[in-house]
Amino acid sequence: MTRLAAGLSIVASATASWAGTTVEWKGSEGAWENAAMWGGALPSRTTDARINGTREKPSQVILARTNALVTRLSVGDGGNSRASLILDGPSLTASAGMDVGKYNGSDGRLVVKSGNLFVGMIFVSGGGGPGQQGHDTIEIQGGTVVTKRIMLGHSSGSHCTLHIVGSKASAIVVEDYLGVGVYNYLEAEKEPPPSATELIFDIDAEGVTPIFTWGKTEGRVRFPIPDNKGNGLGTCKLVLHLLAAPPSGDILLIGAPNQCIGEFTELPEGAPVRAHFENKTYEWKLTYRGGRTKSDIMLTSPRIAAADGRMVPYVTGRKAKSFQFDRAVVESAYREYYRQVDAQQSTLGSGTLAFPGAEGYGAYAKGGRGGKVLFVTNLNDSGPGSLREAIETKGPRTVLFRVGGLIETRGLVVREPYLTIAGQTAPGDGICIKKSESDAAALELSGTHDVVIRFLRIRAGNNTGQFRAESFRASDSENFIVDHCSASWGNPQTLTTGGSLDRFTVQWCVIGEGNNQQRHAFSSGVGGDRSTWHHNLFAHMQSRVPRWGDITVQCDFRNNVIYDWGHGAGYGDLRTLNYVNNYLRPGPSTTQRPPAFIADPKVILPASIYVDGNIMVGKADVGRDNWKGVLAPEGVLTPRSLQSSAPFPAPPVQTQSAAEAFELVLRNAGATRPKRDSVDTRIVSNVRNGTGRIINDEKEVGGWPAYAAGEPPVDTARDGIPDEWKKARGLPLNDPNVANAVNADGYTTLEVYLNSLVVP
């Protein structure tokens, strides 16, 4: 019997620096560890890696001497690209996923000869978008493959192959499902071209290494099936080759706990399938209902062609090698992955907090401390005096507002690190960011670090009819904190984080009223590694309240108030979770039955979720036993086996009981400086009174308020500190050294002034 190799090693050993970028292969053929071919820097845990070539000059990368760990890997995904990656040991990990081929004319190829491949999800020949008609292949000759999901030929017109060669591979394990061919076609294409997918099994004298799908609810094969309009949109052929005379008895091709959806093209249950070796013809019956689960795909009833042409039973003294799924080894793979990720993580900050009251993983973000002061003097989307100009400036900087009102933007992206945005300095009724066009987020952090954002309103909206605009997004960034901000009217999510993230905090924010176009009024994705979410108010969201979105997520989620979610509150993929002293109140739009703190968490290791002190209004039994509010499906891990008896280590947060936090959050969350606006006032009133609902469009609730511009304070030195404040403290009015002078607590005078604006 062959089990997964117990010594599975799946991650890199080299220390990575934070980049949040894509590293591209620059040559033709070469070894992965050749940094020059990557432009001077090897891909790392915090970067994506991309390998592309041309028809005239194809690229081939061989990974044989080093462990490699990246966020996402693409092989031959460009239009008309030709590229291949050969894994010949020891290991390759792409935690967020892998694309093998993608766009029209792509010719991507992944070959696993030996070693261990660990991938979040694998897409071969596209992920369902337009113009993704590649001709791409995965070939597994040996080693071990562990992945969450494999999608083959998911795009109309694509051609792709999954080729399993013999029985040398230790195991091929898919957590969720193996999707082959198109089962979701492109609505925009009136006559979408069909996809063509092949699953090729080369059988040797001991059989072939099977594919195991093991998720209790999702583990299965999904073949192309006609939709309700009769569109089949693709073929999936089974191809058998013989490398030797086959063993007798049954041969397992795909093991699954659930019955497959659809079937191979022109191969119904019991259909004969044939293969040839040395002028001999062998035949089996194909079943989709084999094994103990009655859902394995197998070759049964072997026969061989006799001299007279008749098919007769085939019996030898050799049975096929026996493979079985062993969860313990998958857990071992994840533990090793986490160990290496931990070894590469940045250390937690120390010294001076970002501001008094900053807590959690992002508490020590430096922001613009000690840098220049930049003023936003108008509400323009770009140009001198605009917010865009300020955030795009290089170097440490603190952004202050000299005008209140509504900034309508096509999307602001923070890429330069060491930034503080002090929304509490806006005069009048404060500042609000509104989305004008495109599907980019209204405000985004991308590939940056050490950012502090406070007292800012971000309300994307659907004013142009383009409803796929998120209010705030952070990706590929670390060491940042979002404090006392208000986000609303986003779609598909309103305040969300994803990609390569680490060490961040979202605290004292109001995240409310997602736009429910296409039923996508989703609240927040929680991606990356270590994060703290505390004392936030989530209201009127359909789902993702929040959605933990990565197997690396270590989240401390406490003292939050969640009101009026639709069909689900928290769910998703995670590593560890503290879910402590949160207050959940179902509302008029809540349809989830029974209402739950967390539903269907996707975790690999046991004892990964700690729940304590949470309140579910109307469910006293859930309050007495919080685990009753975790709806974990029965599976390979039983629901109670997910429960941790102790909280996971996390930076300190001043924590109250759920009932106390409810009052504190309703009084203080959101952009309350210089004043709370009518949107947050209405949302808070809804929470207190059990009113309101999920909306489709901000017009249903009156849209953006009018924000008074106000008058900025007199600042003779233009250092960001008003004359009146300096006079009260005996400071000179026009000394250029005052603002950045550092006190005994480590704060500059400018920071002391900014922090004084938010003291109750």
Where are these regions (language model features)?
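Extracellular calcium-associated, cysteine-rich motifs in secreted modular proteins
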Residues: 698-760
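N-terminal extracellular ligand-recognition/capping segment immediately after the signal peptide
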Residues: 53-72, 379-388, 396-420, 426-439
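Solvent-exposed adhesion/ligand-recognition segments of exported proteins
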Residues: 16-105, 240-309, 313, 377-382, ...
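Extracellular beta-strand/beta-solenoid scaffold signature
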Residues: 68-75, 93-102, 118-135, 146-154, ...
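Extracellular beta-strand/loop-rich repeat segments of large surface/secreted proteins
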Residues: 128-250, 582
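All-beta strand scaffolds that present successive hydrophobic residues in beta-strands
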Residues: 32, 85-87, 108-112, 138-140, ...
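Right-handed parallel beta-helix
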Residues: 78-84, 90-122, 127-130, 407-532
